[in-house]
Curated annotation (Swiss-Prot):
GO terms for molecular function: proton-transporting ATP synthase activity, rotational mechanism; proton-transporting ATPase activity, rotational mechanism. It comes from Mycoplasmopsis pulmonis (strain UAB CTIP). NCBIfam families: ATP_synt_b (TIGR01144). The gene is atpF. It is a single-pass membrane protein. The chain crosses the membrane at residues 26-46. GO terms for cellular component: plasma membrane; proton-transporting ATP synthase complex. SUPFAM superfamilies: F1F0 ATP synthase subunit B, membrane domain. F-type ATPases have 2 components, F(1) - the catalytic core - and F(0) - the membrane proton channel. F(1) has five subunits: alpha(3), beta(3), gamma(1), delta(1), epsilon(1). F(0) has three main subunits: a(1), b(2) and c(10-14). The alpha and beta chains form an alternating ring which encloses part of the gamma chain. F(1) is attached to F(0) by a central stalk formed by the gamma and epsilon chains, while a peripheral stalk is formed by the delta and b chains. PANTHER family: ATP SYNTHASE SUBUNIT B, ATP SYNTHASE SUBUNIT B', CHLOROPLASTIC. It is found in: Cell membrane. Belongs to the ATPase B chain family. This is ATP synthase subunit b. InterPro entries: ATP_synth_B-like_membr_sf (IPR028987), ATP_synth_b/b'su_bac/chlpt (IPR002146), ATP_synth_F0_bsu_bac (IPR005864), ATP_synthase_B_chain (IPR050059).
């Protein structure tokens, strides 16, 4: 039984040793824990924070670029809208100018027509007045010539028989008849 007890003792010792190996010693555990804490602190302080800071900066840079792009896009849309508005206003003004010019041209044509018509009417009136004046002058001169001719004829016929008062009466009668 010695052999069995030895084997059992050996087995127990091996098991105990394996058990101790399974759980490290407290100083080794504390040293490992301290190394882990120092490593975590070192990694956090020298790598994680700078990387996080750079990522945050990059994220902010990207966001700023996106915001700037959106702002530029908005400004571009506003400028486009303003340009379209100005273009429409310019088209309206051009249309108004063209319409105004057409109206002015039509008014000028109408004024020239009216002026020409007035001038032609004035010329016609002057011509009619001139014709009337010439007719009156012709009638007056004709009467005078007829009266002169009648007087000469009457004098020749009645030279001896009619006195000058009677002659005037005849001339006045002839003048009076010719005026009618």
């Amino acid at each position: 039984m010695n052999f069995g007890a030895n084997l059992l003792t050996n087995y127990n010792e091996e098991l105990t040793e394996k058990f101790y190996r399974l759980f490290p010693s407290i100083p080794l555990m504390l040293a490992t824990l301290a190394a882990l804490v120092i490593s975590i602190f070192f990694l956090t302080y020298f790598f994680y924070k700078p990387i996080r800071k750079n990522i945050k900066k990059r994220k902010q840079y990207i966001q700023d670029n996106i915001d700037a792009a959106n702002k530029l896009k908005q400004q571009s849309l506003e400028n486009l809208e303003e340009s379209n508005k100005k273009l429409n206003e310019a088209r309206e003004q051009a249309s108004e100018i063209i319409n105004s010019s057409k109206r002015d041209a039509e008014l000028i044509v109408i004024n020239y027509k009216m002026s020409a018509q007035k001038k032609s009417e004035e010329i016609l009136k002057k011509a009619q007045l001139e014709i009337k004046r010439k007719e009156e002058e012709f009638l007056r001169t004709s009467r005078e010539e007829i009266i002169d001719a009648a007087t000469i004829i009457a004098k020749k016929i009645l030279i001896k028989e009619i006195d000058s008062n009677y002659e005037k009466k005849i001339i006045d009668d002839i003048s009076f008849d010719s005026e009618k």
